[in-house]
């Protein structure tokens, strides 16, 4: 009888260790690949870690890696996660998600700060669920609302230049959609794309031919707001931004989500996947429930832009 009890206890202990991941430490091992360091992605990563820590406490350990804006680095980082057999991968931004999707079809992958999963993963017949080992959250803001913001703040403007990185699939998606809305409103829309950080300033200078510039949620732009500001502010050309971080750096106004809250929601999803409460293959992509009209006080003052009373000043 004692042998039977001892065997049963041993099996329980083994099952417990297995349930807490494959790290050998009795903890779930989570690899985080963040494309680049800038306020939006930083906030999403922090929110993710905070949520998962609140749900699982010390049963989770994080390996946080930054790709320094290079998609090839995402591939290297993700391959390292796969080799170390992490229990879950959090891919922060579209290139990180694409690298993870190419590297494994068994380890659960949760994306965040990804605008459009269908275009990022080249999915047909998109129904809101990726399936397989992938799900996550989207940072897609209401592009119709952002177009309406441009019209509200600059009713006399005739031309809008859209400034973005052509190598980011999420940016191209937003450009295509908002161009349709702006054209319907009567604006003449011109896209101005840069390929990397080296030509941000020169392309921004060309975009200043427009009355207003719009910048979508774009990681390269978010990492180069100072360079953009150094061009648009002296030229007296206002920028409406797709998210708060870009607006803080070079814009006048934004209709933005909270990237911290988005990351937090992703962390809650991760907890359910790790504990077996939910199957990732059945989890639909989640979207931010709230959007906030915000403005940059300093830039608005410098450019003489007046915003309605329902806009909130950006913090920091």
Language model regions located:
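Short, low-complexity disordered leader/linker segments with a strong preference
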Residues: 1-29, 54-57
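Extracytoplasmic "Venus flytrap"
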Residues: 29-49, 55-57, 63-73, 171, ...
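An alpha-beta-alpha
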Residues: 30-32, 48, 135-182, 279-300
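Short beta-strand elements in bilobed, periplasmic/extracellular small-molecule ligand-binding domains
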Residues: 54-74, 133, 179-197
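Beta-alpha junction/loop-to-helix N-cap segments that form part of ligand/metal-binding clefts
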Residues: 63-124, 218-242
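Hydrophobic alpha-helical segments within soluble ligand-binding/sensing domains
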Residues: 117-159, 257-278
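Pocket-lining segment of extracytoplasmic ligand-binding domains
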Residues: 169-237, 243
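Flexible loop/turn connectors
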Residues: 245-298
């Amino acid at each position: 009888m004692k042998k039977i009890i001892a065997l049963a206890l041993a099996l329980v202990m083994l099952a417990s260790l297995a349930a807490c991941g494959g790290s050998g430490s009795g903890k779930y091992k989570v690899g985080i690949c963040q494309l680049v360091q800038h306020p939006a992605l930083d906030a999403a990563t922090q929110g993710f870690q905070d949520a998962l820590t609140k749900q699982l406490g010390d049963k989770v350990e994080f390996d946080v890696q930054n790709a320094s804006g290079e998609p090839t680095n995402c591939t290297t980082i993700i391959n390292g996660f796969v080799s170390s057999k992490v229990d879950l991968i959090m891919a922060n931004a579209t290139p990180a998600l694409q690298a993870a999707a190419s590297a494994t079809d068994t380890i659960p992958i949760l994306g965040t700060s990804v605008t459009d999963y269908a275009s990022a993963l080249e999915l047909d017949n998109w129904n809101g669920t990726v399936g397989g080992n992938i799900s996550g959250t989207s940072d897609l803001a209401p592009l119709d609302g952002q177009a309406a913001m441009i019209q509200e703040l600059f009713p006399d403007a005739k031309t809008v230049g859209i400034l973005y990185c052509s190598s980011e699939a999420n940016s191209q998606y937003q450009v295509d959609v908002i161009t349709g809305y702006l054209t319907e409103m009567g604006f003449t829309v011109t896209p101005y794309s840069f390929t990397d950080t080296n030509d941000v300033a020169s392309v921004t200078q060309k975009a200043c031919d427009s009355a207003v510039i719009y910048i979508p949620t774009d990681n390269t732009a978010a990492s180069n707001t100072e360079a953009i500001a150094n061009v648009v502010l002296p030229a007296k050309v206002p920028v409406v931004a797709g998210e708060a971080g870009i607006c803080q750096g070079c814009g006048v106004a934004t209709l933005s989500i909270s990237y911290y809250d988005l990351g937090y929601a992703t962390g809650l999803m991760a907890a359910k996947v790790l504990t077996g409460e939910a199957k990732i293959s059945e989890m639909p992509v989640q979207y931010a429930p709230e959007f906030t009209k915000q403005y940059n006080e300093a830039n608005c003052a410098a450019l003489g832009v007046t915003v309605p009373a329902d806009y909130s000043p950006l913090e920091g």
